[in-house]
C-alpha cells in the first residue's frame, strides 16, 4: 500500500500511468467495450465505475493542454446520450483543475483511437456510451 494513492487504482494501472508519455492516450471503458479485440494492453478494473477511477487517478495524471485531452463516443444516429454520464465524469475530472471540454467522436473513430491507445481499462461501468479517452500532458 502506498500513502496518498487511492487503493482503487490497480497496481498494473499505476505502472501504466507512470510509463505513459505526453501525448499518449488511455481509454477508461464501460463493461461492454470490445477492449480485448482492439489490440493494446488491457487492464481489468471490474466492479469500479469509470467516475470512481477518474477521481482516483486525476491527482496523478496531467491532462494534455495542447490538444483536446478528453474524448467520448457520440451517440449512434437514432440513439440518445444520458447527460448524467458526462456530468459524473466532468465532476470527477474537476477535482484538480477545471475540466476541459469533452469532444465527441463517432463510434468507429473512437475504436480507431482505442486501437492506438497506450492501454484500455475495462471497468464495471454499465452506462451506455460510458467510455472516455484521456490524453496525457506534460507534468509541470
From Swiss-Prot:
One Pfam short name: RbsD_FucU
Subcellular localization(s) per the UniProt record: Cytoplasm
Keyword Transmembrane appears in the UniProt entry: no
InterPro entries given in the database record: L-fucose_mutarotase, RbsD-like_sf, RbsD/FucU_mutarotase, RbsD_FucU
Record-listed E.C. numbers: 5.1.3.29
Pathway: Carbohydrate metabolism; L-fucose metabolism
Active-site residues annotated for this sequence: 22 (proton donor)
GO BP, sorted A to Z: fucosylation; L-fucose metabolic process
Family to which this protein belongs: Belongs to the RbsD / FucU family. FucU mutarotase subfamily.
Alphabetical list of NCBIfam families matching this protein: PRK15420.1 (NF011949)
Role summary: Involved in the anomeric conversion of L-fucose.
Subunit structure, interactors included: Homodecamer.
PANTHER family xref list: FUCOSE MUTAROTASE
Protein name as annotated: L-fucose mutarotase
